[in-house]
From Swiss-Prot:
Signal sequence region: 1-22
Lineage: Eukaryota, Metazoa, Ecdysozoa, Arthropoda, Myriapoda
Family: Belongs to the scoloptoxin-13 family.
Compartments it resides in: Secreted
One Gene Ontology cellular component: extracellular region
MF (Gene Ontology): toxin activity
Protein modification: Contains 4 disulfide bonds.
Residues in coiled coil: none
Main localization (coarse): secreted
Organism: Scolopendra morsitans (Tanzanian blue ringleg centipede)
Record keywords: Disulfide bond, Secreted, Signal, Toxin
Tissue expression: Expressed by the venom gland.
Name the record gives this protein: U-scoloptoxin(13)-Sm1a
Length: 76
């Protein structure tokens, strides 16, 4: 009985301290990589209504009030 309690305690300590990591983290990272591959890089043309710039960038440089504005900006 003591052996079962000790093994259960050891397992719980490993899970709580991160020695045994959850598989969900791996799934999130693959999802993140998929987004990174499909995002628009710096100085790439983007649409201000559908911002798809890579993380850390914003779709900037549009002026909706200007007559020559086409609605396309650059990821900066």
């Amino acid at each position: 009985m003591a052996y079962i309690c000790a093994x259960t305690l050891a397992f719980l300590l490993c899970v709580n301290t991160g020695i045994i990591q959850a598989e969900d983290k791996e799934y999130v990272s693959s999802e993140h990589m998929e987004f990174r591959e499909s995002c628009i890089p710096q100085d790439g043309e983007c649409d201000r209504m559908a911002d798809a710039c890579c993380p850390g960038l914003q779709c900037l440089g549009c002026n909706p009030l200007a007559a020559h504005d086409t609605g396309h900006c650059k990821c900066q």
